[in-house]
Amino acid sequence: MTIEGVYPDPALFGHDPWWLVLGKALAIFVFLVLTPLLTILAERKVMAWMQMRVGPNRVGPRGMLQSLADGIKLALKEGIVPKGVDKPIYILAPVIAAVPAFMAFAVIPFGPAVSIFGHYTPLQLTDLPVAVLYVLAATSIGVYGIVLAGWASGSTYPLLGGLRSTAQVISYEIAMALSFAAVFLDAGTMSTSGIVAAQEHTWYVFLLLPSFLIYVTSMVGETNRAPFDLPEAEGELVGGFHTEYSSLSFAMFMLAEYVNMVTVSALATTLFLGGWHAPFPLSLWDGANSGWWPVLWFTLKVWGFLFVFVWLRATLPRLRYDQFMGLGWKILIPISLVWVMIVATVRAFRNEGYDARSIALVVAGLVVALVVVVLLWKRLRPGRVPAPEKPVEPRGRAELSPETLEPFDPMAGGYPVPPMPGQTLPAFRRTPVSVTGAHSTGPTQENSDD
């Protein structure tokens, strides 16, 4: 035990009895299975309220059992394996996507050390000297399942969805890792429990505001959620990488997506919102950060981030692919590099005995955060219409005479196609159409005496 008996000593990990370790793992598994069910229901309800609808209201009291009914329906559906797929990889891909999402939660601290049946143990399955890097690596493995699902489906749309997901993860994990680096530099550790202990008095959301904004943006892109859901864009790729999946395989992809949402939300809580520390003014109460109360504060913070996911999906349209890539490579990564250099400089001055850390970081953070907001607004503001491009005349087109242009048959393929540069349409003869008597259907009688 360290720091007045509240924060767990790293030596405590690995010495729990087997039944206690099994109980912790089972509790985390139940938490990660139940939270997506509640998140899906809350998402449908909140989006319905934002769109002035009712939402699920049939299954159970006020529709509270709708997620359970959907899960049972998916489990009872027939699993259809399309013809021409790579069957072993096709079956394993959902498992590869779902398992790392569960593994990443092993190092997330739910609370301080407590007594369970006489054994003093931290409310955390385990901890590592590089725990945050472990989470980053585990969440990165999930994209292999998405890519393999797209490749093994034997279809164009799933393959394009898998390739998009790969580019998305590569682009945004760089910015995410740089936001982690700022936290490591200030906390002096990569251990999740150590980072929580470093935020006992001041949360990093205030000291490292640019890192927080960059991480929140990156975590939405990392989980393929709207407005960054390009790998499964319905209007472009039908269903994306899981177009050819049904039944439990499709359910595992959905479970992996929502478990990843919970994981990145828990990591944001751990790194920037003080972890399981009580928010102000509840922190003024002496017992707020001891016992089982911190589990409640941690869960409420995670649900706050989950609400942000739902809010973004209900309010923002999907970005174009070029906008999305430009946001990652032209805005987030350069600003992350500059911010990490600022944090490293402040840390170096602190090591030399200059204790102006809080003031310097807050001032620099506000400036960088303002720059981030302005750049995001300029790039993503509504009504931004790109300037029309002027048509470029092919080289030599103006000098070509009609005699030198290549003859072109627009009906060669059975349907009309436009000519390419350097080709000309043949002259068509117009068939004259006679309109004489077009409205006459028979002889007319004029001045008839009958």
Curated annotation (Swiss-Prot):
GO cellular component, one term: plasma membrane
Region listing for Disordered, in residue ranges: 387-450
Residue ranges of the TM segments: 18-38, 91-111, 128-148, 169-189, 201-221, 262-282, 292-312, 324-344, 358-378
Disulfide bonds: none
Record PROSITE patterns: COMPLEX1_ND1_1, COMPLEX1_ND1_2
GO terms classed as biological process: aerobic respiration
InterPro entries associated with the record: NADH_UbQ_OxRdtase_su1/FPO, NADH_UbQ_OxRdtase_su1_CS
Residue spans of biased composition, Polar residues class: 433-450
EC number(s) on file: 7.1.1.-
DNA damage in keyword set: no
GO molecular function, one term: NADH dehydrogenase activity
Annotated Basic and acidic residues bias: 390-400
Keyword annotations: Cell membrane, Membrane, NAD, Quinone, Translocase, Transmembrane, Transmembrane helix, Ubiquinone
Substrates-to-products reaction catalysed: a quinone + NADH + 5 H(+)(in) = a quinol + NAD(+) + 4 H(+)(out)
HAMAP family from the UniProt entry: NDH1_NuoH
Subunit structure: NDH-1 is composed of 14 different subunits. Subunits NuoA, H, J, K, L, M, N constitute the membrane sector of the complex.
Entry's family note: Belongs to the complex I subunit 1 family.
UniProt function note: NDH-1 shuttles electrons from NADH, via FMN and iron-sulfur (Fe-S) centers, to quinones in the respiratory chain. The immediate electron acceptor for the enzyme in this species is believed to be ubiquinone. Couples the redox reaction to proton translocation (for every two electrons transferred, four hydrogen ions are translocated across the cytoplasmic membrane), and thus conserves the redox energy in a proton gradient. This subunit may bind ubiquinone.
Name of the protein described by the UniProt record: NADH-quinone oxidoreductase subunit H
Organism this protein belongs to: Rhodococcus jostii (strain RHA1)
Gene (UniProt): nuoH
